[in-house]
Amino acid sequence: TPVISSAASDVYKRQLGLPDVDGDADVIIAPIPYELTTSYGQGTAEGPAACIAASGQVELFDHKLGQELPAGKKIRTVQPWSGEGNTLQEQLNGIGEYAAEQYNSGAFPIFLGGEHGILPGILRGCPKKVTLVQIDAHADLRDELDGEPYSHACAIARSLDEGAIAVHQVGIRAYCKQEADLIESDERIFTWFARDVMNPTTGGGRWLEWLESLKQIDGPVHLTIDIDGLDGSLVPATGTPVPGGLSFWHVDQTIDVLFENCDVISADVNEIVAQLDTPLTEFTAAMIATKIISAYILSLIHI
């Protein structure tokens, strides 16, 4: 049975601690407190609320914007997905309906998870066929995990099955033989392994190649960030932490290049787990979500 955050909507604060806004929003923060198939760490259902609460401690000034958020734009944190549905497919369809509401609002939606298994549901509600840009420790290309084809470990495979055009993934460092074979054989999958982009001697050149590859993407893009794509020292409380990952600045630069060069229509930040002894994981996730907001607003200014 899927785990839905017991926090419910009354515990949800507003992103960055900003006051509620009237009228149409420019950016929507949409929490999806969903956990069904997390392998190792538990608690991703509580992640969105923890991330939003932590965002109240994030500085509002953005050096590229040259001003504090919301920078004259309207940021709204909407009510979380309700979790209705008795089966996994009903849950995913419900996430799709929830996502469709956010897309149809005309605002830029940022979905907060919850486990990475939310992604196929989000794309069911997306009005356009998208190319995925994925930051992750795991390829998420398994055909199934423990008999479940919609496990978090299958999120990208199912998203491709359900119509995503392609995936460009970076930070990958934990995957199985079946996934390795698929990466080699499927022309829709472009993988930049952590061992290459983080290589102490040659990683810099490979990283620049990754950034250049993003500039070649045509059409709508959905950015999906599993925070375990970052090094485990930055996100110790996540669904499946893995050492050897990206730095915060790698993620920051990826977001900049994407929004400067591509038609990014939505994003998600997922696999956030609240941690009692240190807020580092949720604060890192909050900073990433805030970076996405800033990059999107900057792209509006430059239109």
Tell what function each PLM region has.
Residues 1-8, 12, 301-302:
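Single conserved hydrophobic/aromatic residue that forms the stacking wall/gate
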Residues 21-111, 116-119, 173-175:
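N-terminal catalytic or cofactor-binding beta/alpha core of small enzyme domains
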Residues 30, 114, 135, 170, ...:
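Active-site flanking residues adjacent to catalytic metal/cofactor-binding acidic residues
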Residues 85-88, 92-95, 183-196, 274-297:
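Short, electropositive alpha-helical surface patch
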Residues 87-160:
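Active-site pocket-lining segments that scaffold enzyme catalytic pockets across diverse folds
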Residues 134, 241-256:
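Gly/Ser/Thr-rich active-site loops/lids in small-molecule metabolic enzymes
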Residues 145-148, 237-244:
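Short glycine-enriched, charge-decorated loop/helix-capping segments at active-site entrances
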Residues 166-236:
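Active-site rim beta-loop-alpha module in soluble metabolic enzymes
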